[in-house]
């Protein structure tokens, strides 16, 4: 998607000023919430720079990953840690902790066993037929989608499992009631 040069000139100055003021806000604001919101402004400005450079997928990934995940995670962590109802001491080891440890260890061992027993040679043979399919794809987003569903399927699924575990952990922490 090509844009006329005059659009670049109109967008460059306000984006640059927003980026500079947002960066100054990240460093100089004393309230951590305002600082995190200022970081969100900086990341949005960077994604607009990617759009100007015709890197649409990178811009969307910037918004989803850095603003939608990392910045929100920072805000949640700050809000949870500033809550006075959660004490700073660690609770003793409980039965639920040992059950969770056993389940996590068994899942880890089964994943390692599956990874070691997969025939990786057969997967590399399917990549040659995928290269023929890749020539028919027209834009970068379609090519990245094809790579995520073929070449990088295992890391993509592992990341989704890690995000699911992080989400469950955040919900558990948020729902925990004071037991003192």
UniProtKB/Swiss-Prot annotation:
Sorted keywords for this record are: Chloroplast, Membrane, NAD, NADP, Plastid, Plastoquinone, Quinone, Thylakoid, Translocase, Transmembrane, Transmembrane helix, Transport
What the entry lists under Pfam families is as follows:
Oxidored_q3
Known InterPro entries for this protein?
NAD(P)H-Q_Oxidoreduct_6, NADH_UbQ/plastoQ_OxRdtase_su6, Nuo/plastoQ_OxRdtase_6_NuoJ
* Catalyzed reactions per annotation: a plastoquinone + NADH + (n+1) H(+)(in) = a plastoquinol + NAD(+) + n H(+)(out); a plastoquinone + NADPH + (n+1) H(+)(in) = a plastoquinol + NADP(+) + n H(+)(out)
Q: Which residues cross the membrane?
A: 10-30, 32-52, 57-77, 102-122, 153-173
How does the record classify its membrane topology? Answer: Multi-pass membrane protein
Q: Localized where? A: Plastid, Chloroplast thylakoid membrane
**Has UniProt tagged this entry with the keyword Protein transport?**
no
Query: Which superkingdom is the protein from?
Result: Eukaryota
GO CC terms for this protein?
chloroplast thylakoid membrane
The record's EC number reads: 7.1.1.-
Q: Name one GO molecular function term.
A: quinone binding
Function as written in the Swiss-Prot or TrEMBL entry: NDH shuttles electrons from NAD(P)H:plastoquinone, via FMN and iron-sulfur (Fe-S) centers, to quinones in the photosynthetic chain and possibly in a chloroplast respiratory chain. The immediate electron acceptor for the enzyme in this species is believed to be plastoquinone. Couples the redox reaction to proton translocation, and thus conserves the redox energy in a proton gradient.
- What PANTHER family does the record tag this protein with? NAD(P)H-QUINONE OXIDOREDUCTASE SUBUNIT 6, CHLOROPLASTIC (PTHR48479:SF1)
Complex formation: NDH is composed of at least 16 different subunits, 5 of which are encoded in the nucleus.
Similarity field: Belongs to the complex I subunit 6 family.
Q: What is the recorded name of this protein?
A: NAD(P)H-quinone oxidoreductase subunit 6, chloroplastic
| Species lineage | Eukaryota, Viridiplantae, Streptophyta, Embryophyta, Tracheophyta
């Amino acid at each position: 998607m090509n844009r006329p040069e005059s659009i670049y000139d109109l967008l460059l100055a306000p984006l640059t000023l927003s980026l500079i003021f947002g960066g100054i806000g990240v460093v100089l604001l004393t309230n951590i919430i305002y600082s995190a919101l200022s970081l969100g402004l900086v990341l949005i400005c960077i994604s607009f720079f990617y759009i100007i450079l015709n890197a649409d997928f990178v811009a969307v990934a910037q918004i989803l990953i850095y603003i939608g995940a990392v910045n929100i995670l920072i805000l949640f962590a700050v809000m949870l840690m500033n809550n006075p109802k959660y004490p700073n001491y660690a609770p003793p080891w409980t039965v639920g902790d040992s059950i969770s440890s056993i389940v996590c260890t068994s899942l880890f061992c089964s994943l390692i066993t599956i990874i070691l027993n997969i025939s990786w040679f057969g997967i590399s043979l399917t990549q040659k037929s995928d290269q023929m399919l890749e020539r028919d794809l027209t834009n970068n987003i379609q090519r990245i989608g094809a790579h995520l569903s073929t070449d990088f399927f295992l890391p993509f699924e592992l990341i989704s499992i890690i995000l699911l575990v992080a989400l469950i952990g955040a919900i558990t922490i948020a729902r925990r009631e004071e037991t003192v």
